[in-house]
Amino acid sequence: MRIFRPWRLRCPALHLPSLSVFSLRWKLPSLTTDETMCKSVTTDEWKKVFYEKMEEAKPADSWDLIIDPNLKHNVLSPGWKQYLELHASGRFHCSWCWHTWQSPYVVILFHMFLDRAQRAGSVRMRVFKQLCYECGTARLDESSMLEENIEGLVDNLITSLREQCYGERGGQYRIHVASRQDNRRHRGEFCEACQEGIVHWKPSEKLLEEEATTYTFSRAPSPTKSQDQTGSGWNFCSIPWCLFWATVLLLIIYLQFSFRSSV
């Protein structure tokens, strides 16, 4: 006689969908780290321009450009040299509230090292970021710098590199359009370079006049727009405005339903 054992019955397996299918997740925009921010600063454009110009300036040596978000000002390993670009121009884009602004106070730090025996050199680079003064978060947009501006900055880097690493007379440094007088107040509390104690340098009027006769600037400020309108304005796509329009829409729908029910 066979004994019936109910626990040995084999039921077909039930494949339940994972909870993630039914769960609603509110995903906040992730804050970008220093490494992500620095990698987004048109890394390919920087390397392309740097390699082309170094191949022309020093074809016998091999140079490499590395983005290093942990680079520190005046903290150098033995044999390394430093160049600090204090008056670069860049456009910032906030990934949280979509606010964009142009800044003439972008600071770029370079550390350089040349191994004469191996005929190889290395450049480490860090672009200091600025925080959005509307919501407090920011990242440097991939299209933050024009290719013409990058070429001018690389020219200054190579000039300093030839002076410090090769002992040559590099030539004259290029002054960019961002070095001109700007009446907008620079907010040091939102500037990463200012927070680390780097003092921004602004050239004298004489240097600006000399540079204006020898260098054609790629982009000039529009005369129709005031300087206060250039860096700020009404951002109707920001989160506060989105909440405002959503509230207005819900209020209109509520009034329509209440009016129909009363009729």
Swiss-Prot record:
The gene is RTP1. Residues 260-263 are extracellular. This is Receptor-transporting protein 1. It holds the Pfam family Zn_ribbon_3CxxC. One of its GO terms (biological process) is protein insertion into membrane. Expressed in testis. One of its GO terms (molecular function) is olfactory receptor binding. It is a single-pass type III membrane protein. GO terms for cellular component: cell surface; plasma membrane. Interacts with olfactory receptors. A zinc finger (3CxxC-type) spans 88-197. PANTHER family: RECEPTOR TRANSPORTING PROTEIN, RECEPTOR-TRANSPORTING PROTEIN 1. Belongs to the TMEM7 family. Specifically promotes functional cell surface expression of olfactory receptors, but not of other GPCRs. Keywords: Cell membrane, Membrane, Metal-binding, Transmembrane, Transmembrane helix, Zinc, Zinc-finger. It is found in: Cell membrane. The chain crosses the membrane at residues 239-259. InterPro entries: R-trans_p (IPR026096), ZAR1/RTP1-5-like_Znf-3CxxC (IPR027377). Residues 1-238 are cytoplasmic.
